[in-house]
């Protein structure tokens, strides 16, 4: 070969350089794509465009296939096709592929999958849901016998007595779901009570690249509940009657759910490593809509949100489709309290639940040598009484003393410095101690000790009282008695310390939580031990409300999810059933306000007859989406129909919530609400205003009249402030009252913000 043949003529040099550059760019792109890590993304396509689910799935591959290069690649990438309640799919994509897909004309939103966390013998009677009463919500709905509650959780333990089908009629004919046989679970375990059991693990398995080892995690790939959370929640919502339920002889009584004859559809989406992946949750919601559930109950949630949730949360978008099809979605508010702005599940179409205590508590008596008895709380000690013996303050005992046996036969007082109370109890026992008193911050949870030693928990204030006794007594002694159950007065209800608080950090105009229910020390079914155990959390308060909602669905079948939420809020109690004000645990303790418990404590005695409701449907939810900044194209795709937001864009303050929350009041504003009469024709209501301090409220009209041709009317509220400086939130209420016993109350939360700063 001649050298001249290797020389590029001048007129071809630019072409060759460009060609080589394109090849390099293409290779770099291939290397980048190969090296870019795939993750699971959910592609939301809004309402279904076809009735045939198979055509819907095929349309998903038509969208994904061209992006990935072939239909085969699309099938390999896609882990779920959402094709029943709405349209969308979950697939393994790189971030660049997800960005490209988000620009597709049929796509509403592309979101990366998230991990969500899992967040009785007395509850129903405490709330007034008395099964023996000849009238009331339980009696009028046959205890919910035709209702189907979908529980999205950690599965179900079908052998629990709480899921017996004694006395139940046939499975409702509208039910389209099924029970599946899988590892350690036989479909024959289902009955007329447990009518559906499915599990969803593709999101979980994809996260682990197919290497998830269920056995190592103490799990089984089936609907079977291995951790007890789903079983506990299901029995709290709709558990059958079970006499003599108890934990170590505590809280003995008849266990039952809020709707004890309702049916259970269990959708396992959470696993023993506390992982609940949104693609699995969304698929379960898709199936639940198809199956015919009346209520969805989800005792789980994400971390405190940092993005606009409706825009970023797969679950919130899927729940929107369920609500638009008439299915209320009840969710846990979270366990990150008592700090403010910790509430999760804040979309306005969700019913978000806070947790309270109730009038049943468990105390471990501690008697000092001066005959003063103090009541330890939150821990359970079931054992023999430890009689009077020497009481020592742990900080006064050296390690050498402990090794020498100074603690033998004695009780130790210990101030918790970290989350090591069980470790300390085990350490004390190993050194011969017969009992420990642990002073700590209260949690409002109920837990049995895992160490075989007498143990009592007190708050730091009582701990200081005990320490003072030790330091001022020559020979301090004490005894610890077994835990006892106390019911009724003088135990007052309080919002539990762990219950997440508002205001809503994403859309502060939307009040969250909506409602509160008992969630501390709830006794319900579990897979192991004696079959029942205590659990605490908004996970436990959520199914209490879900069961009540199931009863409402049967009592008021024409009510929308928003009407049900309104009835819960406007009939709620601000005092406990004995008439005592509800406090909120925290630092400091205070009277509860709307950011602690929404409308208040759920009141099933009144909830079916609220008089008026603040309803929301298609137009009201679109109003919210417009005010939240969604564009017309995204809203149209979400709804499955062409929609154009009005001009000017409506204010989020006018979203027809059963509450008014104004985070930035600087000048007079006017807020609009619409109420629908669900009471007697001819009802007349008058406004009763409890204005927040320094806030002026003017309601127009002050009287609402509902005739035979008028069941809906609109009123306005003018709000202004007399404050001349910024304030924290101030609280009040607006109540519409008639002469028939209806008091339709909504909470008001107003914060003054003065913006005329001079620089």
UniProtKB/Swiss-Prot annotation:
Keywords: Autocatalytic cleavage, Glycoprotein, Hydrolase, Protease, Secreted, Serine protease, Signal, Zymogen. The keyword Lipoprotein does not apply. This is Subtilisin-like protease SBT3.16. Belongs to the peptidase S8 family. PANTHER family: PROPROTEIN CONVERTASE SUBTILISIN/KEXIN. Residues 1-33 form the signal peptide. Its EC number is 3.4.21.-. Residues 41-118 form the Inhibitor I9 domain. It comes from the Eukaryota. Residues 124-608 form the Peptidase S8 domain. It comes from Arabidopsis thaliana (Mouse-ear cress). Residues 34-119 form a propeptide. It holds the Pfam family Peptidase_S8. Glycans are attached at residues 186, 209, 371, 632, 711. One of its GO terms (cellular component) is extracellular region. It is found in: Secreted.
